[in-house]
């Protein structure tokens, strides 16, 4: 599975763990082995620029999903193929959220990456039922990689 981690933040992040998490999401949701995504890690200033440009919202955010192809989870018999798109992470915002949530910044980054990838696959949390489905799946996927319960999400929708 083609997952590229691009750290443009100048801040050390757990690239191996991010790669492992992304591949796990692909595998569990039956995304084709030739599907592609990029995970870009940026500083707060760059994230604020992207947030304004793509969402027309001020200030940095924790994670942004920038979809390319419209992919949905596949099945073992028919995995989804294509370019998922990009997930952009901000370790500075992740660190603030992790501190509020009482867990590590690295765990928060895994949670945010999973959240962003689920958005790329068409999951959302606007409606209560969607939120329950997405956050339950997010929790399960992160827990499977961590080998322990995932931290509770610390973001506000």
UniProtKB/Swiss-Prot annotation:
Please give the cofactor(s) recorded in the UniProt entry for this protein.
Answer: Zn(2+)
**Pfam families listed in its UniProt record:** YbeY
Q: Which Gene3D superfamilies match?
A: Metalloproteases ('zincins'), catalytic domain (3.40.390.30)
GO-annotated molecular function: metalloendopeptidase activity; RNA endonuclease activity; zinc ion binding
Q: Top EC class per UniProt?
A: hydrolase
The free-text note explaining how the cofactor binds reads: Binds 1 zinc ion.
* Subcellular location(s) of the protein: Cytoplasm
Q: Which GO terms describe its cellular component?
A: cytoplasm
Q: TM segments?
A: none
Q: Which UniProt keywords apply?
A: Cytoplasm, Endonuclease, Hydrolase, Metal-binding, Nuclease, Ribosome biogenesis, rRNA processing, Zinc
One GO biological process term is: rRNA processing
Assigned EC number:
3.1.-.-
Binding positions for Zn(2+)?
115, 119, 125
Predominantly, its location class is cytoplasm
Record-stated family: Belongs to the endoribonuclease YbeY family.
Briefly, what is this protein's role?
Single strand-specific metallo-endoribonuclease involved in late-stage 70S ribosome quality control and in maturation of the 3' terminus of the 16S rRNA.
Name the HAMAP family for this protein.
Answer: Endoribonucl_YbeY
Annotated protein name in UniProt: Endoribonuclease YbeY
This protein's species is Micrococcus luteus (strain ATCC 4698 / DSM 20030 / JCM 1464 / CCM 169 / CCUG 5858 / IAM 1056 / NBRC 3333 / NCIMB 9278 / NCTC 2665 / VKM Ac-2230) (Micrococcus lysodeikticus)
Gene assigned in the entry: ybeY
